[in-house]
Amino acid sequence: MPSLKDIRNRIGSVKSTQKITSAMKMVAASKLRRAQEQAEAGRPFADRMARMLASLAANVSGATGGPRLMTGTGSDQVHLLVVVTSDRGLCGGFNSTIVREARRTIKRLTGEGRTVKLLCVGRKGRDLLRREYAGMIVHSFEDVGRRRLSFADADRITAKVLELFEAGEFDVATVIYNKFRSAITQVVTAQQVIPFAPAVATEPAETAEAKPLYEFEPNEEKILAELLPRNLAVQVYSALLESAASEQGARMTAMDNATRNAGDMIKKLTLVYNRTRQASITKELIEIISGAEAV
């Protein structure tokens, strides 16, 4: 049985941990509000951008085929997975769910005879995937949005993806990230970004009479060639915003659970301490009484 001093020390240690987790919960809650506002504000723009490009792509003549970012390379042999995780831990299953989905996708694609390459955003995902798939990682980004997430962060990632695409390093690119729903709910999402798929976001159905007629200057293909790289950056930025909000929500929930568990442990240890102390006092009384009777 542990001594009273040992139990007191353990209670003190758990209380210190509880203070830390409680403080981290409050910090995460503060960051979550800002990250959630950014993610929700960015959704309409990203959705509208995708719908506009889908509508524009529908007008491109099939004769020329359109830009490669829309038509692809004509093959789907090599897949690039952009895996978005965090740089820090203590956020529950936030990173493990993304890595699990990445592993599942890798196994499915390799099982079909495809080649897979990885671009990791976030230290945690890179470290976990490197254990099994070190040879697949072509590039990684750390400290993305460390101070404050900005469009420049998405631009850096997009520039690397486009560089790899133009070099013929892959045929299809998919971003895997956590989409924010609430502080306790994050949905793992796999979104194909190259080639651009108009079917993923289309304008609401319109009658022939109501459908407007547009005249494009310059032609649709040139406009698409300019807008598709920008749309890629927008979609990457949207994924980063969703991931940032999901990370803070997961961290707040994890720290809240840790704080509650610490409170329960303190109660149990206090009960053990009181029982041990009571047993010690009772033992001393018995010894005193026994000694008095012996006299």
Curated annotation (Swiss-Prot):
Any one of the GO BP annotations: proton motive force-driven plasma membrane ATP synthesis
Protein name as it appears in the record: ATP synthase gamma chain
Major localisation: membrane
Disulphide connectivity of cysteines: none
Cellular component terms per the entry's GO annotation: plasma membrane; proton-transporting ATP synthase complex
HAMAP family, sorted: ATP_synth_gamma_bact (MF_00815)
Similarity field: Belongs to the ATPase gamma chain family.
Keyword RNA-binding set for record: no
Keywords: ATP synthesis, Cell inner membrane, Cell membrane, CF(1), Hydrogen ion transport, Ion transport, Membrane, Transport
Subunit structure: F-type ATPases have 2 components, CF(1) - the catalytic core - and CF(0) - the membrane proton channel. CF(1) has five subunits: alpha(3), beta(3), gamma(1), delta(1), epsilon(1). CF(0) has three main subunits: a, b and c.
PROSITE patterns according to UniProt: ATPASE_GAMMA
Function summary: Produces ATP from ADP in the presence of a proton gradient across the membrane. The gamma chain is believed to be important in regulating ATPase activity and the flow of protons through the CF(0) complex.
Protein location: Cell inner membrane
InterPro entries found in the cross-reference section: ATP_synth_F1_ATPase_gsu, ATP_synth_F1_gsu, ATP_synth_F1_gsu_CS
